[in-house]
Amino acid sequence: MENNTSLQQQLLEAGVHFGHLKKKWNPKMLPYIFAEKKGIHIIDLNKTVECLQETAAAMKQIARSGKKILFVGTKKQAKDIVNECARRVNMPFVTERWLGGMLTNFNTVRKSVKKMQSIEKMLGDGSFDSITKKERLTLSRDKDKMEKVLGGIAQLGRVPAALFIVDIGHEHIALAEAKRLGISTFGIVDTNCDPNKVDFAIPANDDATKSIAIIVNYLTAAIAEGLAE
């Protein structure tokens, strides 16, 4: 990984330091706030670098041990980045919407995944040739709908070892489920959120695409290193 100064410079250029309006702040973020500028809280990038490196080391360790980290980012600024990075390191992801019970009711979700996979297989191998075109179309549409929501976790055979969340406020249901099951949590935390809600908080702008991209890419590189070892 690059030295701290160049990493800090990259974070600065990506606008990682821009927090929310002061009036929206969560006082628990105080240790991570450097200043206030024109009514907006500015995040201390020294702290961001520190937290990012700690998170990267922990994620690398999980990946090295062969366990899975579930990437969660359903807001529009995060979707594409999360999808692309998770695929790059063969990690599961949720980018459309979080289905309640995705973790706490994992067995039921697995059944839906299996149903989706069997429809897919049967559509491909001619099993449905005897049904009408309309019925086949309906099945195909059902499969596509399921694929959209469940596609990213199709290969996840068991509950993941950890969750990596972009915007812990937006993904509060996913976070609550992980906490209930004692799953490790990593999260990008902006100035309007409570950093104590995750095991590893990365203080950063969670609204700008560039900011999300630099952090997710950095952590994905750490996971890739862990997988290679």
Residue ranges of model-derived segments:
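Short glycine/threonine-rich loop/turn motifs
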Residues: 174-176, 181-228
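Long, charge-patterned amphipathic alpha-helical coiled-coil/hairpin "stalk" segments used as oligomerization
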Residues: 89-196
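Residue-level signature of catalytic and energy-coupling elements of molecular machines
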Residues: 15, 71, 163, 215
